[in-house]
A protein has these predicted regions:
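Short, well-ordered beta-strand elements
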Residues: 31-43, 63-68, 146-150, 180-182
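Short helix-initiation/N-cap motifs at beta->coil->alpha
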Residues: 44, 67-78, 91-93, 174-195, ...
Length: 341
């Protein structure tokens, strides 16, 4: 976990490093909101966060902002649930898990939608192009085994989209009976599929772009065709931040500005993403991924509500939450509406 502390430029006239720790994030005993901790996972769909950090949008808030990096979603969820972070830039399904377990988490903005591609061996891609949904049965008949998919853990956003594709879009039966799934970290998907340990993956950018450059691999489908408008990540906050009207409106306003920045300055935004993500994501790769259908960045939370409800049903079915989460318990629309007035 990496921590970067900043202090508002407009207050001090210079950029200084804040020293507020987690214990002082929200003041004690219900006091005023003096500072917030923003946590993120360094994945490409969190593009607005990279812009907000590199372009100094967090600096322009009226409070101290501490930015913390988490290596994965589960660790971010644990920190949010324990009160160690106040604002999270992460997946919508982790937010559902938090709410299900009694932690207040309200989604203020979307980050993106339609964020995955099904990448597979060229053999499977060709078979799917010819046979469609029947490709799964044909492959098993020819190879004596099911297609092996690699994807993050059950209940994650890509896992849910993969299940939706198999069960609802293609209608080929229950997920577990149709494919064999291995749980893999997205960053390891390229190595895993190229080594032959899996046949296909539901994967985000820029890893889809890397796999697509391999002539032995090909794109099978885009998640925007599978589950149109499905969410990926968003910005969600705890109750204390939610009640700080000026702060949440400022956060949402900065997010909207970041989305506009991505649209008008995609090359610079890609460079910002590469500089923060690291881990083999070069500027050239980040720029190339900007041209992908799976790079669709938005802020308006209402654009993903219906799809999030469907996704919540699936998260419940795999057992990550007890029951689907009601929209009013997951989203807070007022801040976005206010900055649009």
């Amino acid at each position: 976990m990496v921590r970067i502390s900043r202090r508002r430029l407009l207050q001090t006239g210079t950029a200084t490093i804040g020293t507020a720790g987690i214990a002082g994030c929200l003041g004690q005993g219900g006091g005023s909101l003096d500072s917030i901790t923003v946590a993120y996972v360094p994945i490409y769909p969190n593009m607005q966060h990279f812009v907000m950090q590199k372009e100094g949008y967090y600096d322009e808030l009226s409070i101290d902002v501490t930015v913390e990096r988490f290596s994965n979603g589960p660790s971010l969820v644990k920190a949010f649930a324990s009160g160690d972070i106040d604002v999270a830039v992460g997946g919508l399904t982790p937010a559902m898990v938090l709410v299900d377990k009694g932690t207040t988490a309200r989604v203020l903005t979307a980050n993106g939608r339609n964020a995955f591609k099904v990448m597979a061996t060229a053999e499977i891609a060709e078979l799917y192009e010819q046979a469609g949904a029947d490709a799964f049965e044909q492959f098993e008949a020819e190879q004596g085994r099911k297609i092996r998919f690699g994807a993050p853990p059950d209940g994650s956003v890509p896992d849910i989209v993969l299940r939706y594709w198999v069960e609802r879009d293609l209608g080929i039966g229950e997920f577990e009976s149709a494919v064999t799934k291995s749980k893999i970290n997205p960053a390891k998907s390229v190595q895993t599929i190229q080594s032959g340990d899996i046949d296909a993956t539901m994967i985000m950018e820029p890893f889809a772009t890397i796999i697509g450059r391999d002539q032995t691999m090909a794109e099978v489908e885009w998640s925007g065709n599978i589950f149109p408008g499905h969410p990926m990540t968003g910005m969600f906050v705890n109750q204390q931040v939610r009640e700080a009207t000026d702060v949440v409106r400022s956060l949402v306003d900065a997010h909207v500005e970041a989305t506009q920045f991505v649209e008008s300055n995609p090359t610079t935004a890609a460079a910002h993403a590469a500089s923060i993500i690291g881990s083999g994501v070069s500027v050239d790769l980040a720029e190339a991924a900007m041209g992908s259908q799976a790079a669709d960045f938005i802020s308006d939370p209402r654009e993903i509500v219906d799809q999030t409800e469907t996704m919540s049903e699936y998260v419940s079915e795999v057992g990550n939450i007890n029951e689907p989460i009601a929209t009013e318990n997951l989203f807070a629309f007022e801040p976005y509406d206010a900055v649009q007035e």
